[in-house]
Structures are given as structure tokens and as C-alpha cells.
Amino acid sequence: MKQPVRVAVTGAAGNISYAMLFRIASGEMLGKDQPVILQLLEITPALDALKGVVMELEDCAFPLLAGVVQTDDATVAFKDADYALLVGARPRGPGMERKDLLEANAAIFSAQGKALNEVASRDVKVLVVGNPANTNALIAQRNAPDLDPRNFTAMTRLDHNRGMAQLAEETNSTVNDVKKMIIWGNHSSTQYPDLTECTVNGKPALEQVDRDWYENSYIPSVQKRGAAIIEARGASSAASAANAAIAHMRTWALGTDENDWVSMGVYSQGEYGIAKGLIYSFPCTCSNGDWKIVEGLDTSSDFSQEKMKATEQELSEERDAVEHLLP
């Protein structure tokens, strides 16, 4: 049996974590031969609820669960962490402007970035799930100057999966038949679900769907899927977000399938003309615990450029709104 790895999870008593922790403890994220120690962070008022979740984890008697830490102190939760899933974030309350939300979360993710910088493993893999995920990841990254910026990622795998599922439905195929889906940009309604490189059953996706459907139905539907779920369920997507977080980490740790890629919000070095330092979703391949942006794709069409720039613009504006709070 391998040595246990430490997996930190914030917002650990929340809905997304409740749909995620049991799957991590069962080996679904890092493999059936990898023991894990869960290091769970919550705000002080939620520690009792967290205790209940931990009791349930114990009652599952997972062979791979080598230990559980429960705390309201980030430096305890992130101590020697190999993986960190930052799920907890301030939700948008009634009458809150986006700017208020950005600032409230800036305080949370600054503190978490500092704690990661101080105590986490130097190779820690950080995934930000809590929204606004891309900018929260940027805030954490900027507060962790001793860690490689490449260690910080934001989740667009949920959008990626939504895009695959809706394309599979339209083409009467299964998600297994869909390859090379791309989500560019922000995990928000400005994201660009791009089918230019995508294939279904080995053939170009755009030859199998109507262009009008793609531009005017598919793209807005993927962009607004989160809102549609809130409308229908009366609560935001939790199980599907948990599933995407597990898939993002599993791919990062264990690698992408051959001849395919995934979408990840990662640190831009100027690829595809995107401003350096933004956390922007690109198509990525993973191997040996590292990610790499897929380069050399043709994004020169006016349609693609307009969409990629619009979501970049939103990310730049979000960064500018919190710049005064960043080191």
C-alpha cells in the first residue's frame, strides 16, 4: 500500500463537499491503491455540522481513509497538504453586487493563499471550486509567492462536462463518443464552449450539428446551465460540481486519456494572446502530475476571437476590482 496523501477540503460541511468527501475517501479521486488523510476546514459556526459529516465518514469504514482532521484553522487544514480543494466561498446574498461578492471572497482566499504558502507541501495541487472560481484562484495564487503559480487551478470541468453532455444529446451519441471539447475563459456566463476541434465518433462535431443551433442555442445553454439548475432545483448544482472537482483532480494526478484533453482554469503565460497572470480556462493535457496547455489550435476566426476576448475582458475586470487587495 502507498503512503497516505493529505487532501485538504474547505467548506467541508457544505453541499458540494457532502457530495464529494465520500467519493474521495473511497478512492475515486486518486485511485483504489492510494490511502488519503482528509483535512477538513469549516468556519467556526459550522464545526458541529462538520462533526456529523466526519461521523458518517467513520461509519463508512473506508479502507483507504487513513485519517480525518476537522478544524476552523487554515494552517491546520493545509499542513503538508498534497491536494487542496477550495470549495468554501461566500455565496451571493440578496442585493449583493458582484463587486461586493468579489471583495468578500478576496478576504477568504487571501487568507487561504497565505496559509497554503506557509504550511502546504511545495507541490500542493490547488483546485478552486468556490465562485467566482477563476478570480478566487488568482487571489489565492497572488498570496502564495513561494508556490509555483502552476499549482493553482480553477474548475471549468463542470462546464466541460455540460458541453459534452449537451452535444452528445443533440447528436444522439454518448459522452464517450465526444472528444476534444473546449471551454475557454471564465467559469461564468461569458465562457466560450468551443466545438471547433471537437469530434463525435471521430468526425468533426460542427459537421454534425446545425450552425445556428451551435451559436444560438448550444453556447448560451452551456453558459447558463448553472442558473437553469438553480431555477429548477431551488438550489445550486452540488453533486455535479463535486463530480467535476473529483474528475479535475483525478486527471491532474493520473493523466488525460490519449487523444483527448480537458478544460482547466490555469495560469496564463500569454498563450493564445490571453493576458499573462489571469486564471483562464484552456484545453489542457495532463501527465506525471502536471498540466500543459494544448498549443497550436486555430482560434483565428472572428467568432472565436470575439468570444475569447469577451471572457478575458471579464476576468481582467474582476482582477482589477480586487487589485487593491492583492499583494
Curated annotation (Swiss-Prot):
The active site is at H187 (proton acceptor). GO terms for molecular function: L-malate dehydrogenase (NAD+) activity. Substrate binds at R92, R98, N131, R162. NAD(+) binds at G11, A12, A13, G14, N15, I16, S17, N105, Q112, V129, G130, N131. It catalyses: (S)-malate + NAD(+) = oxaloacetate + NADH + H(+). One of its GO terms (biological process) is malate metabolic process. Keywords: NAD, Oxidoreductase, Tricarboxylic acid cycle. Its EC number is 1.1.1.37. InterPro entries: L-lactate/malate_DH (IPR001557), Lactate/malate_DH_C (IPR022383), Lactate/malate_DH_N (IPR001236), Lactate_DH/Glyco_Ohase_4_C (IPR015955), Malate_DH_type2 (IPR010945), NAD(P)-bd_dom_sf (IPR036291). It comes from the Bacteria. Pfam families: Ldh_1_C, Ldh_1_N. Residues 304-327 are annotated as: Disordered. The keyword Oxidoreductase applies. HAMAP family: Malate_dehydrog_2. Belongs to the LDH/MDH superfamily. MDH type 2 family. Catalyzes the reversible oxidation of malate to oxaloacetate. This is Malate dehydrogenase. It comes from Psychrobacter sp. (strain PRwf-1).
